[in-house]
Amino acid sequence: MRTPLRKSSTIALSLAALIAGALTLPAAQAEESEKKGTIQIEYEKPKDASLQQTYDMVRAANALEMLRLVFVSFRLPEDLYIKAVNCDGIPNAYFFRENDKPTIRICYEYLKSVREMLPKETTPEGITPREALMGQFLFTAAHEFGHAVFDIYNLPVLGRQEDAADEFATYFLLQFGGERAHRLIRGAAYAYYDYVQKNKDKPKVTLPIAAFSSDHGTPEQRFYNLVCIAYGADPKVFAIVVEKGFLPETRAKVCKYEYSNLKYAIKTLVSPHVDEKLAETVMAISWFTPPDARAPDNWLP
């Protein structure tokens, strides 16, 4: 479960065109793999008229088709369903078994809330509207996919599963590599970063007592955990998170160990279920080409 988190003169690439051009090779290779299950997608029409625009946008952007592509390298023993749905006013995304079928639901309310909170322009920290959109969307989807992975493969999880799903999502985004991973990670952290920035100068942050009983970490904890794993994975690419004070040096010192432990867990428990060659093909797709490419214009404020 996930709680919500320049314009170029030559915008040559929309997400819809990206999917249309990139889907063919991985799909063909996937048919040759030994996996039995596939990823099924569905866009439910919203009952709430105020969500019709969001529905139209995600359909035009082929948002779920993109998710099917980025997760195609997993050998699934059964079908996994990813649905965009109306959630009765609640901005959310979650995994559960619907009639015993593993299902990820991404609420139109959540997608609408992400769009509404995007920065109007590139932030002082260099986060573009596209990065904030793509990073948050992919992080949320990968978080829920992490829950699906734990369930479908019956993987043991020590500690809170929500923390494990966050770590899975962070690791997944890092696999895009280098500058692409940097852009996705800072985009994913945008919602948490915005919250932390608004409260960082306060001597105390007041939270309702119930926040400490939640199966989710607080926004501050989730932000620091995310950037710590990223910094631990590549201290050079993510050096700015320490230089700018986003990650305290006291925590930064142990991040390489946190990432190392996470990588070992992923390689031991998850990697045996992944078609590595297909994964390399998917991760090599130029998700951010050209460098100034953005999400479709109608997704941005």
Positions of PLM-derived features:
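Bacterial N-terminal signal peptides that target proteins for export
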Residues: 2-15
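Second-shell loop/turn segments in exported
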Residues: 49-57, 91-94, 127-136, 148-161
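C-terminal segment of classical bacterial N-terminal signal peptides
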Residues: 19-27
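An active-site-proximal "capping" alpha-helix that borders the catalytic cofactor pocket
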Residues: 158-177
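Acidic/histidine-rich, surface-exposed loop or edge segments in extracytoplasmic proteins
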Residues: 34-55, 150-153, 168
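Auxiliary, metal-adjacent structural segments of Zn-dependent hydrolase domains
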Residues: 56-122, 130-135
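Pan-zinc metallopeptidase signature
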Residues: 33-41, 206-301
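Active-site recognition of the HExxH zinc-binding catalytic motif
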Residues: 139-152, 166, 170
